[in-house]
Design a protein with these regions (language model features):
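Short amphipathic, helix-prone segments within low-complexity/disordered or flexible regions
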Residues: 3-6, 10, 14
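Long, highly charged, low-complexity intrinsically disordered interaction regions
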Residues: 21-24, 76, 82-101, 110, ...
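Duplex nucleic acid-engaging cores and interfaces of nucleic-acid transaction enzymes
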Residues: 54, 67-73, 80-338, 342-442, ...
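Active-site proximal loops enriched in glycine and acidic residues that flank catalytic Cys/His/Asp
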Residues: 341, 353, 394-396, 423, ...
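Extended, hydrophobic alpha-helical segments in both membrane/secreted and soluble proteins
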Residues: 335-352, 358, 374, 378, ...
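Generic start-of-chain signal for non-secretory N-termini
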Residues: 13-40, 47
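N-terminal cofactor/phosphate-binding cores enriched in small/glycine residues
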Residues: 34-69
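Phosphate-backbone recognition surface of nucleic-acid-processing proteins
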Residues: 367-379, 398, 548-568
């Protein structure tokens, strides 16, 4: 969740970083199809500390009605373009300090719209270790390169033999290193080769010898070959996981023979055959430039691009799955018995009342020869507390425990409780968390999971916000994707979900309040502490009495906080 304080920003007004006309606001406006003044006004709101949920709901007149999705896209692009602008500034300063910044290069850098292209332009000016090419240049071999490329004889190398270059062969190797470095730092050439590689290349994989048995889940990839453009994100992640587990040998191949790419290099650098003595040298430079530099860097780039694209697609799917879980219809304020299934360690059980308060806990062992005893104990609890819902976790022993729950329901006096099997993903993580320890300091860790299972049936959103979104189990490859990207994406979903339905300020836990627009973790704790000391809030204005909850935070949060029974609920 973004802190309620103002953002750190690089100016988004037209500046020398963006050339004469294009501001960050105008770039985003063009991409989103929104008027520039509306984008700029929205950026100003974000910089002032306003959150996306607040802007989406209460500043429609400023944004022109942009929804949560558009505002999130604007926010992401704003961060990217500001990072790009800052990087441009750094690179321009570096090249200027080297005395190599021309007006043409400055304009090229200012016009760049991607980080990859920017780094391509910076390649020739990067300060790096002394390369073979640098050593060769210091030895004066740059002059030899000029003579050779002008059609000079290879015998000229004899005249450059010196310390460090003991014979003609080592001199020619030094000359070649100079040309190869020039090839590998030509921004336009690097970009063209990279795009051709991505357009024409193929992902290939094969099983590593001896891994056939243990790698059966990857059998679809034992003899695999598919164009990059046809690879769905889940297949990319499967290939990379198989490679990481030592089952698959994965290769991101160029898709064309070497001659195709070498032809592009020769054409773009003027290293085609000229029918003179230096043709062999030219061909050798092109071949080395491709095989040792551009083929390697292009394969690395493809791997990164495919992974990034797969990560983004996967996070999008995971986010939708999480949203569905969070916004699942709550069962409501009904007494619930939560059952956390298990074999040897028993079934952990907890009864909570309609507000989620824990009334009773017990561990029974129906799957260890004590079925009848377990049924009797739980039937007694159901009747004692008027339980209306039986929430069964879907983990180990779930099916057998569900059968037990249905028998218990059949024995209930009066209205028969309803049995529901729900996801228990993250319950064990919650059980051992600091939040759970604060909530139930005297309760055994194993029983906390049963409480969580019962409560998440009553109100999924209120309970699931206590758990790290990554622990809820939202997708098959969630541990393979970029974890920072995943955390940010899922965090956004939780924030939007909480603010879309609002929060009862007199019932909400600190973790739930923390997800409300403008409410920081400290502020959430202060709200709960004030409520515990002074009783339920009577009105929204009373929130201003909470320590550190000032007018700015109140403006952001008030619209998302409900006070049932108040004059302004």
């Amino acid at each position: 969740m973004r802190p309620s304080g103002a953002r750190t920003s690089v100016s988004s007004s037209p500046s020398r970083m963006w050339g004469m006309t294009d501001s960050i606001a105008s770039i985003i406006a063009h991409e989103l199809g929104v008027e520039v003044p509306r984008v700029q006004a929205t950026i100003d709101l974000l910089d002032g500390g306003a959150t996306v949920p607040f802007i989406a709901r209460y500043r429609k007149e400023v944004t022109g009605g942009m929804d949560d999705g558009q505002l999130r896209q604007l926010e992401q692009r704003l961060d990217y373009l500001r990072e790009l602008a800052a990087r441009k500034e750094t690179i321009l300063k570096s090249i200027e300090e080297q005395g190599k910044l021309t007006d043409e290069l400055r304009q090229k850098i200012l016009a760049v719209d991607t980080k990859a292209r920017l780094e391509d332009l910076y390649l020739p000016f990067k300060k790096s270790r002394r390369t073979k090419a640098a050593i060769a240049r210091e030895a004066g071999l740059g002059e030899l390169v000029e003579k050779l490329l002008a059609g000079g004889s290879l015998d000229l190398a004899e005249g450059y033999v010196q310390e460090g270059f003991a014979d003609a062969a080592s001199v020619m190797a030094g000359a070649r290193a100079i040309v190869v470095e020039d090839i590998s730092t030509d921004a336009d050439l690097v970009g063209e080769i990279r795009e051709e590689y991505f357009k024409r290349g193929r992902a290939e994989s094969a099983v590593i010898e001896g891994k056939e048995e243990e790698g059966q889940k990857y059998r679809d990839y034992f003899e695999f070959d598919e164009p990059f453009g046809d690879l769905p994100s889940h297949r990319v992640l499967a290939l990379l996981r198989g490679e990481n587990e030592g089952v698959l040998r994965v290769n991101f191949a160029p898709g064309e023979d070497d001659e195709f790419y070498q032809g592009i290099i020769a054409d773009r650098t003027g290293l085609q055959a000229q029918g003179d003595p230096a043709d062999k040298f030219r061909a050798e430079c092109v071949r080395f430039g491709w095989r040792t530099k551009l083929a390697v860097s292009s394969a690395v780039d493809v791997r990164m691009r495919l992974k990034e694209k797969a990560d983004q697609a996967a996070v999008s799917v995971f986010s939708k799955n999480l949203k569905d879980l969070l916004l699942a219809a709550p069962a409501g304020h009904r007494a619930t018995l939560g059952l956390d299934p298990g074999y040897r360690n028993g079934v952990k059980c907890a009864v909570v009342d309609g507000t989620g308060k824990v009334l009773d806990t017990v561990v029974v062992y129906p799957h260890s020869g004590q079925w009848d005893k377990a049924r009797t104990i739980l039937s007694t609890l159901v009747n004692k507390h008027g339980v209306e819902l039986l929430a069964v976790g879907n983990g180990t022993a779930s099916r057998e425990t569900e059968k037990l729950a249905k028998e218990i329901a059949g024995l209930a006096e009066g209205t028969k409780p309803q049995t529901v099997v729900i996801s228990e993903a993250g319950a064990s993580v919650y059980s051992a968390s600091e939040v759970a320890a604060q909530e139930f300091p005297d309760m055994d860790v194993s029983l906390r999971g049963a409480v969580s299972i019962a409560r998440r049936l009553q109100d999924p959103l209120a309970e699931l916000v206590k758990i790290d979104p990554k622990s809820i189990g939202v997708g098959q490859y969630q541990h393979d994707v970029n974890q920072a990207l995943l955390a940010a994406g899922l965090d956004t979903v939780v924030e939007d979900a909480v603010n879309s339905v609002g929060v009862d300020v007199n019932l909400a836990s600190a973790p739930l309040l923390n997800r409300v627009a403008g409410v920081t973790p400290t502020l959430a704790e202060n709200i709960v502490a004030y409520r515990d000391e002074n009783g339920a809030f009577k009105s929204r204005k009373e929130l201003l009495k909470v320590p550190r909850l000032g007018p700015k935070a109140f403006e952001q949060a008030a619209g998302f906080l409900r006070i049932n029974g108040a004059a302004d609920p």
